[in-house]
A protein has these predicted regions:
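Short coil-to-beta-strand
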Residues: 1-9
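Basic/polar, cationic surfaces and motifs that engage anionic cell-wall
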Residues: 21-141
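Conserved beta-strand segments that form the floor/walls of ligand-binding pockets within enzyme
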Residues: 9-11, 47
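A generic structural motif
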Residues: 13-19
Length: 141
C-alpha cells in the first residue's frame, strides 16, 4: 500500500542518540494540533516511520517522547494499571491488531519495543512488554 500518498510525514532533526530538544517538541505539538484540527486526524493515527514500516525504518529513536504526545492527544499510550494477559493471548495477533505489519515478527517486535518500551536491545517480548501490548490491544477492541 502507498502510505505516502495518504499521510503527512514530519521529519525532526536528531542524531538518534540523544533526546529531542524541548523547543522542537513544543513546535511539533503546535503543528500536530493544527493538523489534527484541520484534517480531523484520529488520535490513533499519529504514528512513527518504524510503526508503519518496521522492516525499513527505525525512526524515531527511543528518546522520542511518545507518552508526552499521547498526553496531548497524538497517538495512543497505555495506562499504568496492572493488566495480566489472558492465557490464550496471542502477541503477534495483538501487534497486527494495533497496526503493525507482522510479516517479519522480529521487526514488528523491535518497532513496538522502540515506541512503547524505549528499548532496542532485545528483540523478544518479555512479560512487561506483553502486559503493555495487552493494554494497547484492549484499547483497540
Amino acid at each position: 500500500t502507498d502510505v505516502n500518498s495518504v499521510s503527512i510525514g514530519i521529519e525532526l532533526d536528531n542524531n538518534g542518540h540523544e533526546p529531542f530538544p524541548d523547543a522542537q517538541i513544543t513546535s511539533l505539538l503546535q503543528l500536530l494540533a493544527r493538523l489534527k484540527k484541520d484534517y480531523g486526524i484520529p488520535t490513533a493515527n499519529f504514528i512513527g516511520h518504524a510503526d508503519i514500516a518496521p522492516t525499513r525504518k527505525n525512526d524515531p529513536n527511543v528518546f522520542f517522547p511518545w507518552k508526552k504526545l499521547s498526553e496531548h492527544g497524538f497517538g495512543l499510550w497505555y495506562d499504568n494499571l496492572p493488566a495480566i494477559p489472558d492465557s490464550n493471548f496471542n502477541s503477534i495477533l495483538a501487534l497486527r491488531i494495533i497496526g503493525y505489519d507482522v510479516r517479519d515478527t522480529t521487526a514488528a517486535i523491535r518497532s513496538f519495543k522502540r515506541h512503547f518500551m524505549q528499548d532496542t536491545a532485545t528483540r523478544v517480548l518479555n512479560d512487561a512488554d506483553r502486559q503493555v501490548l495487552y493494554k494497547l490491544y484492549q484499547k483497540y477492541l
